């Protein structure tokens, strides 16, 4: 079986909504290649192990790569996706580009691994692919062994890095953590490495739960993290000290009240996946519900907010 790689170059303002359209139409993962990441490469303060390659990024804007099963990707679906994208108010119609290529099953399964190498994601955390060998550079370094699978991120996105930095700052061993939209499980593993004993990882996608469980096994914490399917926090009855959600902004907006109600007094809501054009609305909503915003990080057009539950 082959796969169709649909490549779209668009402006930054349309990235979140375009990604949502692709995922809603059945894309098996979306790769985001942001030209800002090449122009504004992070300082080498965390000892990044490899440099970004110019040929992997568009000259300007953002390249989205979506992957569709050849059995379901037909002319009707192709046109439907294109029509919905071109109808986005945020889209710059003059600079959008579409292209496609066919990827054989064997290439699809392995080619992406060529771009995933060990890297320092934050001051403490280093992400290590499960198929590579890596030696710690310092005793305090915390290594997360990761095999994200084809449909989940490798941890190098700015939103993940900012969440890891927030975990370093606000999560303590005595805390309890719930990770909403866990994906590969990277943020739950980071919390475990900090020393947290009670961790629950949720994802609406059962494939994500399966991938997360395998990564928990690789990091020797499969019996210490509860990984279950879950629709955000709608059915959650337990209380936690930390709620983490690195998901899309419109989904975060839906769960702010539930996050507040799930937290113990003084607990923290760590959330990212928010493009800069959306963060003020998310921040205002959090404040209306009762959160005190105590941290705001920005990185290449993405934002991470930390709100604390503090009653009047």
Curated annotation (Swiss-Prot):
It is an enzyme of class 2 (transferase). S-adenosyl-L-methionine binds at residues 160, 181, 203, 246. One of its GO terms (cellular component) is cytoplasm. It is found in: Cytoplasm. One of its GO terms (biological process) is methylation. Gene3D superfamilies: Vaccinia Virus protein VP39. Signal peptide: none annotated. It catalyses: L-lysyl-[protein] + 3 S-adenosyl-L-methionine = N(6),N(6),N(6)-trimethyl-L-lysyl-[protein] + 3 S-adenosyl-L-homocysteine + 3 H(+). It holds the Pfam family PrmA. GO terms for molecular function: protein-lysine N-methyltransferase activity. It comes from the Bacteria. SUPFAM superfamilies: S-adenosyl-L-methionine-dependent methyltransferases. Keywords: Cytoplasm, Methyltransferase, S-adenosyl-L-methionine, Transferase. Its EC number is 2.1.1.-. PANTHER family: ELECTRON TRANSFER FLAVOPROTEIN BETA SUBUNIT LYSINE METHYLTRANSFERASE. HAMAP family: Methyltr_PrmA (MF_00735). Methylates ribosomal protein L11. Belongs to the methyltransferase superfamily. PrmA family. This is Ribosomal protein L11 methyltransferase.
């Amino acid at each position: 079986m082959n796969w169709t790689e649909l490549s779209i170059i668009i402006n930054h303002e349309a990235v979140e909504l375009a990604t949502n359209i692709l995922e809603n139409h059945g894309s098996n993962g979306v790769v985001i290649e942001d030209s800002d990441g090449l122009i504004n490469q992070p300082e080498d303060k965390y000892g990044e192990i490899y440099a970004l390659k110019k040929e992997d990024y568009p000259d300007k804007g953002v390249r989205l790569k979506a992957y569709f099963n050849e059995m379901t990707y037909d002319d009707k679906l192709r046109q439907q996706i294109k029509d919905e994208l071109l109808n986005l108010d945020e889209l710059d119609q003059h600079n959008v580009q579409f292209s496609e290529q066919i990827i054989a099953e064997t290439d699809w399964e392995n080619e992406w691994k060529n771009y995933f190498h060990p890297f320092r994601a934050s001051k403490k955390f280093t992400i290590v692919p499960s198929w590579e060998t890596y030696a710690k550079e310092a005793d305090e370094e915390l290594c997360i062994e990761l095999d994200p699978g084809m449909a989940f991120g490798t941890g190098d996105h700015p939103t993940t890095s900012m969440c890891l930095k927030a975990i370093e700052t606000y999560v303590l061993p005595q805390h309890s953590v719930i990770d909403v939209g866990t994906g590969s499980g990277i943020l739950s593993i980071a919390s475990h490495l900090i020393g947290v004993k009670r961790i629950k990882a949720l994802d609406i996608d059962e494939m994500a739960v399966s991938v997360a469980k395998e990564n928990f096994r690789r990091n020797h914490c499969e019996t210490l993290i509860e990984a279950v399917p879950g629709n955000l926090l709608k059915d959650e009855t337990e209380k936690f000290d930390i709620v983490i959600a690195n998901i899309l902004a419109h989904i975060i907006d839906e769960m702010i009240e539930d996050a507040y109600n799930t937290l113990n007094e003084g607990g923290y809501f760590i959330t990212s996946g928010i493009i800069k054009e959306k963060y003020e609305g998310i921040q205002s909503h959090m404040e209306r519900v009762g959160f005190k915003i105590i941290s705001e990080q920005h990185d290449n057009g993405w934002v991470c907010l930390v709100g604390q539950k503090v009653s009047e």
